Amino acid sequence: MDFKDYSWTEPVSDYKSKYPYNQVMETESGHIVEYDDTPGAERIHIAHRNGSFTEWYPDGDRVEKITKDKYTIVMKDDHLYVMGKCLITVQGDAEIYV
């Protein structure tokens, strides 16, 4: 399988923050929490100093980037509904246990 036929790219943040609508808190080690209320460009950005982040865009999109491993633990039911296309790219091994 050629990955170029199934490729996609990480969306780029359309950062249009304007004073005084952007509130940023940065900790001493570099963690960031940002609330941007710039009209038409509202977004929320939460970042760890290691580069992992979650960002919500003005149009409702959300990007989550994790620089190492990710674990999701659901103690009861889990439901996933995708109204459009679902594209999963695994560049390595994949295992599913049922």
What are the functions of these language-model segments?
Residues M1-V98:
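Structural signature for extended repeat/solenoid scaffolds and their inter-repeat hinge/linker regions
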